[in-house]
Amino acid sequence: MMFKSKVKSFYLSALLLSAPFSYAGWQLDNAHSHVNFVSVKKSKIGEVHYFKELSGVLKDNGKAEINIDLSSVETNIGIRNDRMLKMLFETNLFPDAKISGNFDVNKIRKMKSGSTFDVNQSFTLDLHGKKQKMTTKVRVIKLSNQKIIVSSIQPMILNAGDFKLINGVEKLREIAGLPSISTAVPITFSLTFNVETR
């Protein structure tokens, strides 16, 4: 009886220790996540911009939902921030960009802390009233049973024309008096997720 009691206690303890990571989802950590994009003007001058407000979840069924607050764009020039909001993103009509996809969470659960794996990840980007299916290569890093990082391995190229942003780019070019602004935009990201406890 004592042996059975010890075995039962062992399995109960193991279940309690593993439950948060095995059965809960993950919450995006905005303070340790970033989405960057590069604008190229005059065919040779590149500048890095980013968004300050990100939110999202990776659910225990593998469904990922990421929200980018477009009004949080930061270009390090105040008037340019305002112009992007009004002329490019039209945040009065389209305040957010949304990313959705499915991850292999079973593979993540089986990973050891400190291990990584690379995968060609498909997802849907909902931006400026248009949805596009896209694929990019990402690296998943399991820092611990409570924290993972999903980051781009190489820049992803967003074509402004796919999201009806060409007119906005042209407005920015005209008001800034530039000869050109590229409509092909490189994007990189690093997203940190913390396990949700129940």
Give the location of each predicted region.
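Bacterial N-terminal signal peptides that target proteins for export
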Residues: 2-11
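Short, charged low-complexity linear motifs
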Residues: 12, 23-24
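Low-complexity, acidic/polar, glycine-enriched regions of mature
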Residues: 24-198
